[in-house]
Amino acid sequence: MSSYPNTKIYNTLPKILRHRAETIPNTVALRDKDLGIWNEITWKHYNDQVSYLALSLVKRGFKTGDVIGLIGDNKPSWLFFELAAQAVGGMSLGIYRDTLDEEVGYLIDAAKVNFVYAEDQEQVDKILTINRPKGNKINIYYEDSRGLKELEDPNITDMLDLISEGKEIASKHPDKYNKMIDKVSADQEAILCTTSGTTSNPKLAMLPGGKFIEHVLRYLKVDPKNINDEYVSVLPFPWIMEQTYGVGFNIVGGMKVNFPERPDTAMDDLREVGPTFMLGAPRLWEQIAADMRSRILDAPKITQWLFNVMVERGLKAVDQGKRDFLADKLLFSSLKDRLGFSKVTSAATGGSAIGPETFKFFLAMGIPLRQLYGQTELMGAYTLQDVPEGTMDCETVGVPFPDCEIKIIDPDPNGLGEIITKHPSMFSGYYNNPKAYKETIKKGWMHTGDAGYFDDQGRLNVLDRVNDIAIKSDGVKFSPQNIENKLKFSPYVGEAVVIGAEKPYLTAIICIRFSIVSKLAEKWQLAFTSYTGLAADKKIYALIEEEISKVNEQLPDNIKIAKFLLLFKELEADDGELTRTKKVRRSVINSRYKDIIKDLYLDKDTASIDTEFTLEDGRKSKISATMEIRHLIDTKTSKTTKAKSKANKSSKGKK
């Protein structure tokens, strides 16, 4: 802890930033890749940019308590504006860059935003669609000037002009910025962070700057970071965990943050950096694992055989809390090097549950991946796995951080109940929504809505949302998410929705991982022109059937998947089926695809849908499709169907 700034003195992020600029001015704080070149940003330059923007924003009317909206890719400019707002005593509201126009408008209006950093023309255009009363214009600041330079709008300004303006103010009033940030207290709300929004529109959690710092320090006690650590920022800044690492661990811990040139170059750029720490949501880890397994499809058969044998050896060793020397020598060490993970000493996954097979795969590779658990309202994670050498834990999210308390309320006979929690650095409320705060915080405890239990070692196991824990018609409880995560370990399964609440058996709606399945289809010389056509192909059905059968072998007889179908489209956040953090909105799926779900529980071989629904942006969409229902288990006898073995044979050896 002694290497971290004294937060009793430096109790806001801008104050800590200034302290670093004064004590280690020429040390690299950030790197940003542009046109193939990594540009280094020192602590002094970082602090200068923030101070110039803050002074300019004040001149333009930004004041204590105001909110600045931020939308774009992860870039240093985002951080400059975020810290500038906090320097004034204002708040930042991060918006996911793929958010639709109408969603952007909802968030901007909900937070009463009058100032916005929009990275480029695409994001500026979204802000311009927001209708505001005459004379109440939104001030927009951009970084990428392409397509914007010729605009003659006094409310749209290049951020370079703000920096120049602020620099001039600083030259005339050298103490103005320091006096400004010294007035801002630790209790001042600094960040507006959106909740996940799985059941409704996201709420805006208000995070005081001082409490955010307190919790970052709490985290650093269990997972220390310093100026020698390297991190690549690939997850969106609006997510609380990227705020923790990309902002908190950077400024408070000193960890260097590297920004890829573009989202689609992130993995290549990561290899160049060689990070010491990696954070990924489960979907990222699933995609990396799937990509590695798919690449082997193009390799000679002997290489494919070696890959599969070594992976199996590695996974068996992990189950015993060990590493397999031969598998590491022949496979995993080269995989780590190819991914850019050779220097990783700490890695984490959070945001939702990760499938145990995916988790074990990275442990077998030698990546010290650990699960964490938390909520936006509690400043992010407050548990982290601590796995002693020679043991293995792929089920729990570990134990609470110091000063964090967790209880299970209303437990069933097996100890499963709702998780409630509290710690000293919680959020101060939901912006302009006191009713929601009272519903969430009761007697100081946050009711998470998650279902979990403690194991005999006091480790927390999170199963699913309380409302999503399902009970079959025979009274058997199961977690759809747990089964879905097992399915998504397959490189061919992009998304899965398991159904079975109040039903006699389980079924699944599957979305294929098009990027990988299409590659396999080309190898098999299958004719297709679209996702829909490929998802209807019988050979692809046979492929997915084989993958589901592997998962069924791991499941108890009373919760095996009896039937499945391949959905004619991918689930999309823009269609309201996923959140912006890619979590399934089950209520939307159950409503939109109710006809399909009904057919899955009838004695039918096809499911049909013919309906119209409203998209997130208000547009109407008409759906008309018929899909094959594949039977894995005879629902009358509970025996595996003969069709399965035939299908599996037909899928093997196809070229």
Sequence positions of predicted segments:
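Conserved AMP-binding/adenylation subdomain of ANL enzymes
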Residues: 213-230, 237-332, 343, 368
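Conserved ATP-binding loop and adjacent catalytic segment of the adenylate-forming AMP-binding
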Residues: 258, 337, 343-349, 354-417, ...
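Conserved ATP-dependent adenylate/AMP-binding module captured primarily in the ANL superfamily
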Residues: 99-129, 213-232, 263-277, 338
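Conserved ATP-binding/catalytic segment of the ANL
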Residues: 407, 414-472
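Conserved AMP-binding A3 loop
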Residues: 40-44, 182, 190-214
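Conserved AMP-binding/adenylate-forming core of the ANL superfamily
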Residues: 30-83, 100-105, 158-163, 207-210
